[in-house]
Amino acid sequence: MSNIINAICCLINNPIINLQATYLGRNRINNVGDALERYVQDLFINGFNLDENQRNLAIREHFSYLGNTSNPPDMMLKGGDAIEVKKIESKNSDLALNSSYPKAILTADSPMITATCKTAENWQQKDMLYVFGIVNGENLQALALVYSVDYAADESVYETIKQRIKTGVETIEGVEFTPTKELGKIKRIDPLGITNLRVRGMWHIENPFKVFSYVYERNFDHAFNFMAIINDEKWQALINRQELISLIEHTPNAQLIDINIKNPNNPAQLKSAKLIQFFVGESA
């Protein structure tokens, strides 16, 4: 089974910066977002030198589910993490999550996932691994791998706020509401009764390079910057971690550092974690 260690080792051994030259126009990949997602898949299956048939077999071997643009997650590793891939076009911009708040853990009973995802394998919950790529034109400038449990608060934090807003909207007098999973849906607003209003939440979250700037800073003179943060509990569960340790020892541009990160539910508490950082040369 593949995991984050395999992906990081593959990235260090195969640093690809130009997504356009590598992916666009091939295999129905027509935009940078799709190219980034395919790149992430290739990291987990070591798929850069595989032909399409070999790649399909590797996907089947390592992934139980590949998703769509409407429902999380983007992919699930067999017996492993759920993965969400997010593209950012500006180095410091926030990430739009649209109508769903961040999830620390993905559960099989989540109303956000598809029936196919729920039955893709025998599972109850999965760690959520967010993969953030900063893309400038055709080039991948930075990539971050961060587990949501180290990045987002418990679901109750977001759900409580959402329900308070929803309740407040529904107490407005003189309008006709209809049941909805959104914050509100109001019917027949105008005299003809032909206009409706949907009230939707639009969630944003700061990108991880800003959130974790107290333990990692990008060097903008580099053509490519990479960071991954893995809490110690997860790190100890990764049985192939020695493979990455050995690779980093022989890679001048890579480092493995012990750090302390803030608990997303209580920033007064710190937890031990590993920071993996890597860079590629000077930018042109």
Predicted regions and their residues:
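Short acidic loop-to-beta-strand element that houses the catalytic metal-binding Asp/Glu
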Residues: 69-82
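Nucleic-acid endonuclease domains
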Residues: 1-72, 87-284
